[in-house]
């Protein structure tokens, strides 16, 4: 015969588990990212690595928290943030006027150089040469925004990531891929038939995106100031990005 214990006996236990769960959430900073953009964020042996990933981890450490990540398509990052699925987003996200209407941003933590990756037999030397070329870039990036500002909208083919863009270049479907200098260097080193040159410097830096009016924005800016003052931010930039000018 089963004995039915009073429900009130279990209430403290349930309450305890509930408190632990809330405490755990309070100690975690959940970032959205897209692990398809080395050396900023990428997957290696099933683990996210890169410049942005280490910045997020150091920010969390300064704030006494643990950084965790949700890896997704770049185009899904800001919608995930808008719907409250994550606390913040770090994934080479350019601070633009349009984005600032919807989201808060941290202070910029990096200003990228824009580079043209091309086949060595058909080099690109400057921005003017792009007007005669078919151009690939990653959807929603600084490069797409910048190319449109140069009145090159009709020349652009967008891809989900730069790996797809490079494959299109190697196959001859496009003439040039415009991307960040750090990634241009990596792709050129991995593909002997390719090279790159720096064609411009972005005026809009990368920032960490947050929900509008989030109190976390001030905390993250404080952490970035700490990392800038103690030299850790510069160390990370040297470690992951090095010298990409060419």
What feature does the model see in each segment?
Residues 16-18:
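C-terminal motif of bacterial Sec signal peptides marking the signal peptidase cleavage site
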Residues 25, 142-160, 192-200, 224-246:
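Ligand-binding clefts/hinges and TM-proximal coupling segments of bilobed small-molecule sensing domains
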Residues 20, 53-62, 121-124, 128-134, ...:
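Extended ligand-binding regions for polar small-molecule ligands
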Residues 53, 69-79, 139-142, 157-167:
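Short helix-initiation/N-cap motifs at beta->coil->alpha
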Residues 24-92:
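Extracytoplasmic small-molecule ligand-binding "clamshell" domains
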Residues 79, 91-101, 149, 170-202:
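A ligand-binding cleft/hinge motif common to bilobed small-molecule-binding domains
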Residues 65, 93-94, 107-155:
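A conserved helix-loop-strand patch within extracytoplasmic ligand-binding domains
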Residues 33-35, 110-118, 181, 185-225, ...:
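Periplasmic-binding protein-like
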């Amino acid at each position: 015969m089963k004995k039915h214990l009073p429900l009130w006996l279990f209430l403290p236990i349930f309450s305890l588990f509930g408190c632990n769960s809330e405490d755990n959430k309070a100690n975690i900073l959940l970032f959205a990212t897209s692990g398809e953009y080395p050396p900023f964020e990428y997957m290696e042996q099933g683990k996210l690595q890169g410049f942005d990933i280490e910045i997020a981890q150091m920010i969390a450490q300064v704030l006494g928290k643990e950084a965790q990540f949700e890896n997704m398509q770049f185009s899904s990052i800001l919608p995930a943030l808008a719907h409250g699925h994550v606390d913040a987003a770090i994934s080479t996200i350019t601070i633009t006027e349009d984005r600032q209407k919807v989201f808060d941003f941290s202070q910029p933590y990096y200003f990228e150089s824009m580079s043209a990756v091309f086949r060595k037999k058909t080099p690109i030397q400057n921005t003017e040469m792009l007007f005669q070329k078919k151009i690939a870039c990653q959807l929603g990036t600084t490069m797409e925004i910048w190319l449109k500002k140069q009145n090159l909208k009709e020349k652009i083919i967008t891809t989900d990531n730069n790996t797809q863009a490079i494959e299109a270049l190697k196959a001859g479907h496009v003439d040039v891929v415009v991307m960040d200098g750090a990634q241009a260097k990596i792709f050129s080193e991995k593909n002997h038939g390719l090279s790159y040159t720096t064609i411009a410097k972005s005026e809009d830096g990368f920032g960490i995106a947050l929900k509008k009016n989030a109190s976390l924005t001030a905390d993250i800016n404080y952490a970035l100031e700490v990392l800038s003052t103690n030299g850790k931010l510069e160390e990370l930039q040297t470690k992951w990005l090095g010298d990409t000018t060419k």
